[in-house]
Amino acid sequence: MKKMAFIDMEGVLIPELWKHFSTVLNIPELAITTREVADYKSLMKFRINLLKENNIPLKKLVGLIKEIDASPNAKEFLEHLKNNKKFEVKIISDCFYELLDPFFDQLNLPIDNAYCHNFEINSNGYIENVIYNRNKGKHEIIVDYQKKKVPLKNSIAIGDAFNDFTMLHLVDHGFLFQPSEEVSKNSPFYFHKVESYQEIIQYLTNNRVA
């Protein structure tokens, strides 16, 4: 059985989408992310209300997504994990299928290997609510694998924000990728803080996680 690599999308493999929306739409409050706010559900209620107040439907956001590319070398990093290090890559993201669709193609990731959320859209095309893939946190996905007796020895997890902490706790090797000062300051000492994909690859090689 391949080892598992549980990886976040925004801030790790792709840019922070809401920061892009904030800049293009000129709504500074949309730039707030889980690097600053730990309570994701409260953050999403705040974002949805902002979009409604500014009359921004989902199709507007989807159009803006087309302007964004995955992070440089992200695809090559994933291919290296899969082909050279023999990891099975699983995406665990608090983003939404409706926004991530173009990136699955860019990164050569099967959508079946992703655990994301969905938007609930009203008849006028505006985001009304969130249909959550899980209730408590990203760790729930890993716990499900544990319950199914899937071998997770030497598995890794990569995230960048507070909402990634719970999944990083459950693997042998947890990486914080380019964390903010606030996230870094409040993270457990045993999380590995890295600034590049190459640092992760080097760590896996040096520690023979292959």
Regions found by a protein language model. Give the residues of each.
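Short, Lys/Arg-enriched, disordered terminal segments
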Residues: 1-2, 204-210
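Alpha-helical substrate-recognition element adjacent to the catalytic core
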Residues: 2-116
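Well-ordered alpha-helical segments embedded in enzymatic catalytic cores
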Residues: 73-76, 141-144, 199
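Acidic, Mg2+-coordinating phosphoryl-transfer loop and its flanking beta/alpha structural elements
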Residues: 93-94, 153-195
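Substrate-recognition "cap/lid" segment bordering the active-site pocket of phosphatases
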Residues: 101-155
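Short, acidic/turn-prone active-site loops that include or flank metal/cofactor-
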Residues: 114-121, 179-183, 196-200
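Short, charged, surface-exposed secondary-structure boundary motifs
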Residues: 122-128, 184-192, 202-207
